[in-house]
Swiss-Prot record:
MF terms in GO: malate dehydrogenase (decarboxylating) (NAD+) activity; metal ion binding; NAD binding; oxaloacetate decarboxylase activity
InterPro entries: Aminoacid_DH-like_N_sf, Malic_enzyme_CS, Malic_N_dom, Malic_N_dom_sf, Malic_NAD-bd, Malic_OxRdtase, NAD(P)-bd_dom_sf, NAD_malic_enz_proteobac
Organismal lineage: Bacteria, Pseudomonadati, Pseudomonadota, Gammaproteobacteria, Vibrionales
Organism: Photobacterium profundum (strain SS9)
The gene coding this protein: maeA2
PANTHER family listed in its UniProt record: MALIC ENZYME-RELATED, NAD-DEPENDENT MALIC ENZYME, MITOCHONDRIAL
Name of the protein this chain belongs to: NAD-dependent malic enzyme 2
Positions that bind a divalent metal cation: E243, D244, D267
Active site, UniProt feature: Y101 (proton donor), K172 (proton acceptor)
Entry keyword set: Metal-binding, NAD, Oxidoreductase
Pfam family, one: Malic_M
Length: 558
């Protein structure tokens, strides 16, 4: 009946036990448990295994044709029986990943108030400032080890979604568990409800958030500071992941807190790590080094610049000087190529701007366009976060680069710069591609091209597992670089010349294990974690890796 012989002693019984999603087993409660936990008559007579339950749940799932309906159905299982939820995802991860996260989660965030069923996590409203410590004590889960937090201002490519952004922390933490084996009992999604500037939400009678323009400036900073201090007091060893903060706040918050608490920003650092991992794999498949590439970005926000800085760091590790590495990076935004004579560049953009004297001849009549950059700079890599890749741009790139590396990273799918089928057709099948959203394999000239999804889920679950297992107190740039290196080593295309740039999702547990070990070892090496041998770290990682299995229950007094 039970795959795990461990016994759990519980004081809960009756409806209270059935309503606890972490403990509920539904029809899998044994006759003895039904008797001892006052469940007699509360469940149908059949005693089922989790395998039988999973088969029924999947059969029900298949009756839905609409992705949003599938998302709502899975979220309902998550809120009633988390063990079954993760068993279902484990067995169908490639099919269900796009449903529980991108691209479907984007629509779920937009419709959050309309599809709301029950609360999950914490909603920290600005009117509650001064009481955040007390609110954290209200959390249903007390042993919190990983927090994902958003303020809902920049949700995917969809902009300000207010508290609808809560769908992102919920989805990200589901992937921490499904991909990285983090016990769901140790996770907590949080949204900072500081208002919204989305007029549609403010006028929507169904909107469930605080109806107020967004708090900004010092008031905003003070509210975030109160949250950070409250977490340090309540869960001093928790890992905090910042998620989908607007550009004006994302980098400043990361810089303010990265050396004070164990935290990272997935949009900046996680996206950078998975992108560098994809590039390292592509370079290996093409028989070159990353330091040999010339890289153009379409989009010069915090995410794009974060990726660029990670690439610079890797190029330096391969032997280039800082200036030589930066000379190979071309950042293009809606005004054209970023150059050092432009006004109003943000701090993180200034370091990546090209010297105007070097590129002034590329367009003497105005701003330097993407096509100008491709024609004159002759990039071998094109990355969009987000942007627009036209046929003319891709074909011009292919004219001087036999195997161009093209990464259209925008999500959800509706926002992608160019589809893989177009890119493959425009390059006669020569392009190496990884996308931000999932795409089916492309058939061109009777050959099938699997499309890798450059998804942060390859990175952050392993980072979380490595941080928890090692007891790391910080997330360093070197730990993130290790995760990129390990991901590249897992690439099927780099290993044998066949397959996608990144490993299939069915192998995600193995990938997360490998990344976790590399991250943990680097944390120990940098004295950010207690000294442990590799064997001890492996044992820790295995002990932290939660599996969706039912345990035996014994009743104990309150």
């Amino acid at each position: 009946m039970y795959e795990n012989n461990k016994t759990l002693y519980l004081p809960y019984a009756g409806p209270t036990l059935l309503e606890n999603a972490l403990l509920n087993k539904g029809s899998a409660f044994s006759p003895e448990e039904r008797q001892n936990f006052s469940l007699m008559g509360l469940l149908p007579a059949a005693i089922e295994s989790i395998t039988e339950q999973e088969e029924r749940a999947y059969s029900q799932y298949q009756t839905f044709n609409d992705d949003m309906d599938k998302h709502i159905y899975l979220r309902n299982i998550q809120d009633t029986n988390e063990t079954l939820y993760y068993r279902l995802i484990d067995n169908h991860i490639e099919e269900m990943m796009p449903i529980i996260y991108t691209p479907t989660v984007g629509a779920a965030c937009e419709q959050f108030s309309n599809i709301y069923r029950r609360g999950r996590g914490l909603f920290l409203g600005y009117p509650d400032k001064g009481n955040i410590v007390d609110i954290l004590n209200n959390a249903a889960r007390q042993d919190v080890k990983i927090i994902v937090i958003t303020d809902g201002e920049r949700i995917l490519g969809l902009g300000d979604q207010g508290i609808g952004g809560m769908g992102i922390p919920i989805g990200k933490l589901a992937l921490y568990t499904a991909c990285g084996g983090i016990n769901p009992a140790n996770t907590l999604p949080i949204v900072l409800d500081v208002g919204t500037n989305n007029t549609q939400l403010l006028s929507d009678p169904m909107y469930m958030g605080w109806r107020h323009p967004r708090i900004t400036g010092q008031e905003y900073d003070d509210f975030v500071e109160e949250f950070i201090q409250a977490v340090k007091s309540r869960w001093p060893n928790a890992l905090i992941q910042f998620e989908d903060f607007a550009q004006k706040n994302a980098m400043p918050l990361l810089n303010r807190y990265k050396d004070k608490v164990c935290c990272f920003n997935d949009d900046i650092q996680g996206t950078a790590a998975v992108t560098v991992g994809s590039l390292l794999a592509a370079c290996k498949a093409a028989g070159s080094e990353l330091s040999e590439q010339r890289i153009t970005f379409v989009g010069a926000g915090s995410a794009g610049c974060g990726i660029a800085e990670a690439i610079v760091a890797q190029m330096i590790a391969e032997g280039l000087s800082d200036s030589a590495a930066r000379a190979r990076i071309f950042m293009v935004d809606r005004w054209g190529l970023l150059t050092d004579n432009m006004q109003n560049l943000l701090d993180f953009q200034q370091k990546l701007a090209q010297k105007s004297a070097t590129v002034s001849q590329w367009n003497e009549t105005g701003n330097i366009s993407l096509l100008d950059v491709v024609s004159n700079g002759k990039p071998t890599v094109l990355i969009g976060v987000p942007g627009l890749f036209s046929q003319e741009v891709i074909m011009e790139m292919h004219a001087h680069c036999k195997r161009p590396i093209v990464l259209p990273l925008s999500n959800p799918t509706s926002r992608v710069e160019a589809t893989p089928s177009d890119i493959i057709r425009w390059t006669e099948g020569d392009a190496l591609i990884a996308t931000g959203s999932p795409f089916d394999p492309v058939i061109f000239n009777e050959k099938t091209y699997p499309i890798a999804q450059c998804n942060n889920s390859y990175i952050f679950p392993g980072i979380g597992l490595g941080v928890l297992a090692s007891g790391a107190t910080r997330v360093t740039d070197e730990m993130l670089m290790e995760s990129s290196r390990v991901l590249a080593e897992c690439s099927p295309l780099a290993q044998n010349g066949n397959g996608a740039l990144l490993p299939p999702l069915k192998d995600i547990h193995q990938v997360s294990h490998c990344i976790a070990l590399a991250v943990a070892k680097k944390a120990v090496e940098q004295n950010k974690a207690p000294q442990r041998t590799e064997k001890q770290l492996l044992e820790k990682i295995e002990s932290y890796f939660w599996k969706p299995e039912y345990l035996k229950y014994k009743r104990t007094a309150l």
